[in-house]
Amino acid sequence: MTPALPPALLPGVFVSGSSDAGLAAARQLGALAVSYPKPVAEYEASGTAPDAAALGIRIGIIAREDADEAWTVARKRFPEDRTGQLTHQLAMKVSDSKWHKQLSRLGETPASSEQPYWMVPFENYKTFCPYLVGSYDRVADEISRYVGVGYRTIILDVPASPEELDHIGVVCERAAARVAP
């Protein structure tokens, strides 16, 4: 570009990091590889984290002060849908996408108040990333745990409304407070 941009203003380059080929391309380009995370407890239990500093994750967030309210909002926004489930199953049969198969396996763990990691939107072909659902504090804790295993870049699924973005902002503020030095 002419004139050259200051380095701080250069845009980041992101590449899908869900396959070995994508990871190799990201390394070669000096880009950040973006993947779909497992539940953070899996990284913590294994004792080995991915090269998270070189990776970003994509998630959705639905949170409220009260976890029950968050789950009500989540289920209303992403109701189970037989047509979506069939479309998802068909996509699984015809796709050679590694990330699609990985995410489908992750959906086998049910979400609960103990586990905010929720795959129903993906399993019903409504979006293509896991969601974290629960109280502001529980979801902020989960995000801070992802930071704890090394992730530094989080890309959010599109919020449903400006109000939803405000709720996500509360979670981000609380997560930042937990990981601040």
PLM features per residue range, with description:
Residues L5-Y43:
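Loop-centered beta-sheet repeat module
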Residues Q28-L29, V149-Y151:
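Structural motif
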Residues S19, P39, I61-A63, A160-P162:
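Active-site-proximal loop/turn and secondary-structure-junction residues that shape catalytic pockets
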Residues P11-S16, A31-Y36, A53-I61, I154-D157:
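Hydrophobic faces of well-ordered beta-strands that scaffold small-molecule active sites
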Residues P37-P50, P162-H167:
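Active-site-adjacent beta->alpha loops and helix N-cap segments on the catalytic face
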Residues M1-A4, Y43-R145:
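An alpha-helical appendage that flanks or caps ligand/catalytic pockets
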Residues D166-P181:
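Alpha-helix-loop-beta-strand connector modules within alpha/beta enzyme cores
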Residues D20-A24, V40-A41, D68, D137-A140, ...:
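Amphipathic, non-transmembrane alpha-helical secondary structure
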